[in-house]
Amino acid sequence: MSGTILENLSGRKLSILVATLLLCQVLCFLLGGLYAPLPAGHVTVLGSLCREDHARQNDTSFLLYSRGAGACIPVTREEVEQDSTKMANELVHVFQMPLPRDLRDLDYSRWQQNLIGVLQVEFGYDSSSELREPPRELQLTIDMRLAYRNKGDPDNGWKLYAHGVEHRYLDCVTSHVGPTETLYSCDMIPLFELGALHHSFYLLNLRFPLDTPSQMNLQFGHMHDLTLTAIHQNGGFTQIWLLLKTMLFPFVVGIMIWFWRRVHLLQRSPALLEYMLIYLGAALTFLNLPLEYLSLVYEMPYMLLLSDIRQGIFYAMLLTFWLVFAGEHMLIQDAPNKSTIRSRYWKHLSAVVVGCISLFVFDICERGVQLRNPFYSIWTTPLGAKVAMTFIVLAGVSAAIYFLFLCYMIWKVFRNIGDKRTSLPSMSQARRLHYEGLIYRFKFLMLATLVCAALTVAGFIMGQMAEGQWDWNDNVAIQPTSAFLTGVYGMWNIYIFALLILYAPSHKQWPTMHHSDETTQSNENIVASAASEEIEFSHLPSDSNPSEISSLTSFTRKVAFD
């Protein structure tokens, strides 16, 4: 039997391979740390006040803008205060993005991929009012109109992108108490999310309709400053990210083809671990496929959802593989039958299934609906927020249970190996050296698996933080977030690349000999190998099942044989 490359590769060649992969890992970290900006950037826009004609209020094609030819005449705060009705149902809050800089109009780039808007609301009451602390979960009704135009379009060439009347719930605190007015500042609320940043300029019109019979927006007094924070993916980070994907994609495809060809050259059906490796490589290939290049030409609002699905498939496959990888090296063969996912691992994978389904349902409820209505958010209602939090907590608990169980399985593997090592002194010298080398290599690989699992969890958390939080310090030479994200992404590719190489079947064939001749022949091999610079841990003859891909898994049978 030939065994795997991990078992038969010489120490020098293995050291060169590991050193090369570690160098590639360092380069992935440096690529993100030295050349990539923060994953997300933002711009803060203070809303401009415009007054609209009553006759155009229900005309969704009528859009007000604050810059350029034909812009509306801005209304000052003093004019609003002097009006007896505070210009109710006449005011439009206008946000034009992006803001100009140094007297030069800026535009969005398609490299920036997506755009998210969150709103900070400030409103006031007359101090004569008895209300001092507003009630919690105030319902605010907003008429929202989002428009766009591109380079070369006239200043008034805005086209409606989406329109909706949505409800948001506010939690506010008192920010200022004056002699005539009390101001309240509210928490940020999600406003819109665009899965594709395809156009050059965007315009947002917000109206807060008042209606006495339905009590619409009557509990808010009058609006003061509205601040919109528009968050986008940084174009420089997207370029580095796609460069990394473009470079890694052909290498993973090539090593998968090479691995599967070597498996099919054997006179047996592929083992479970070999199937899992090729499935894992396929999931990584799907993740590496740089589909984002298409968004530079076509408008693809579903790209965010597609990216989440691709990453979810990879996470599910990676977590499944780790359990099978540890389970197949437990050195316990309960039954002579071939291992299958359903027969041996369905209990182990329950946490993975629950967590992945929870996150998938949450993603469909959020970004799936946003394909038709970019103003929708599951977090905007108390019930929706509780449901979303339930899914996230359920996924988090499942992840914690999974990681603890994976650590337990790896600990059990190490314990079993330790128990079996007590049998090594009774073996022949050649066989003892063979298994000591295999055990050392396997322990190193399992520790690398634990490190990869820990960094994967940390990378997932940092990725989620990058979507919702922003670093306000612009004077940082190396951005840890970008370095970490590119480093973890490179680590996935390097780790799977190494597994496909090390667990590929070796084509080295070793002569079959009788047990009585084994010690003499093996000692001669050791003497001959010692004269060389490379000592290979050759796969010694055994009576193991030909369907096993690692001689370490048949260690127990070897002990009995000796």
Curated annotation (Swiss-Prot):
Cytoplasmic topological segments: 1-13, 261-270, 333-344, 412-441, 504-562
InterPro entries in alphabetical order: WLS-like_TM, WLS_GOLD, Wntless
Composition-biased stretches (Polar residues): 541-556
Alphabetized UniProt keyword annotations: Cell membrane, Cell projection, Developmental protein, Endoplasmic reticulum, Endosome, Glycoprotein, Golgi apparatus, Membrane, Postsynaptic cell membrane, Segmentation polarity protein, Synapse, Transmembrane, Transmembrane helix, Wnt signaling pathway
Location of the region described as Disordered in the Swiss-Prot/TrEMBL record: 539-562
Glycan attachment residues as annotated in the record: 58
Superkingdom field: Eukaryota
GO MF annotation, one: Wnt-protein binding
Lumenal side: 35-239, 292-311, 366-390, 463-482
GO biological process terms held by the UniProt record: imaginal disc-derived wing margin morphogenesis; intracellular protein transport; positive regulation of protein secretion; positive regulation of Wnt signaling pathway; regulation of intracellular protein transport; segment polarity determination; Wnt protein secretion; Wnt signaling pathway
Disulfide pairings: none
Subcellular location: Presynaptic cell membrane; Postsynaptic cell membrane; Cell membrane; Endoplasmic reticulum membrane
Chain ranges passing through the membrane: 14-34, 240-260, 271-291, 312-332, 345-365, 391-411, 442-462, 483-503
Subunit field text: Interacts with wg; in the Golgi. Interacts with Vps35, a component of the retromer complex; wls stability is regulated by Vps35.
Membership in a protein family: Belongs to the wntless family.
Protein name, entry field: Protein wntless
Lineage: Eukaryota, Metazoa, Ecdysozoa, Arthropoda, Hexapoda
Gene name of the encoded protein: wls
